[in-house]
């Protein structure tokens, strides 16, 4: 059981690390009246239809009554932060003369994104960095139509980049220095090109 609100990538990483499956309750990028259950297999990727079909086929089954077992409350963040150190060159990010503006969209990434950058002394500005079950009356979806405030902030701040994620932080959006939305597919292509070179 997680000690805190938890982004999907943090739980997925720990599932793989601990060779365990995980269950998460999340509305993801949907409106606040929604809530779903996300099953994360031990390989940390999306569950295949073969796996989810088995789960669905057992929804109506009766569970035997028994004594409650002890539940361990766990902090999944430290292992994830250590893993990120092997992937991200925080020093290079710190050396950039770019203003980072992060829109938390009232999501599960609040407390994680700011911790990651703060510990590494990377300055950033932020929007919507408090938990709100109604997502401030908006949608926790990092698409341009829901990022108008972030887009305006980037346009009005010289040499800046805008970043946002959805409710459980497994989808992202990027706003370039001109206030233009850069899709996740474009970002992945840019990263692949960079890694190849």
Which residue ranges define each predicted feature?
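Gly/Ser/Thr-enriched, mixed-charge loops and adjacent short helices
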Residues: 35-157
